[in-house]
Curated annotation (Swiss-Prot):
The keyword Transcription does not apply. Its EC number is 1.11.1.24. The lineage of its organism: Eukaryota, Fungi, Dikarya, Ascomycota, Pezizomycotina. Coiled coil: none annotated. Keywords: Allergen, Antioxidant, Disulfide bond, Oxidoreductase, Peroxidase, Redox-active center. The active site is at C60. It comes from the Eukaryota. One of its GO terms (cellular component) is peroxisome. Gene3D superfamilies: Glutaredoxin (3.40.30.10). InterPro entries: PRX5-like, Redoxin, Thioredoxin-like_sf, Thioredoxin_domain. One of its GO terms (biological process) is cell redox homeostasis. Homodimer; disulfide-linked, upon oxidation. This is Peroxiredoxin Pen c 3. It catalyses: a hydroperoxide + [thioredoxin]-dithiol = an alcohol + [thioredoxin]-disulfide + H2O.
Amino acid sequence: MSLKAGDSFPEGVTFSYIPWAEDASEITSCGIPINYNASKEFANKKVVLFALPGAFTPVCSANHVPEYIQKLPELRAKGVDQVAVLAYNDAYVMSAWGKANGVTGDDILFLSDPEAKFSKSIGWADEEGRTYRYVLVIDNGKIIYAAKEAAKNSLELSRADHVLKQL
């Protein structure tokens, strides 16, 4: 079941997440993963959740994530409360990737979709179990924009510039 504008964000969606901490800000520092209840956390916020095939991969690292970091002030100006990036990598890798990109605090959450469970449930994961490149904009629990890229290395519909035009 893929999601589309007008749908409710599903209930019971949990991701794995390591919250950023000042005392564990070095890339080699290790935090403790927690369950991040996305259904609850996204219920009363405007959220941009973008997914990609994997941390530290070429298109994701060179273009996708850096553009969201750069465009964060513009997204906030358009009323976005939370930006989150999602991949099948475990929470430790996602946490290190956030640190490698200089993201501190909860400006952008680096979330793990263990075994691509959520992405598979909406039909947006490949046969290898990697998340597709996609974006969901959720406003108070309702999907207002949903798009999946046509190919793994495509970066059009889910890029920050395109999402800004949808807000």
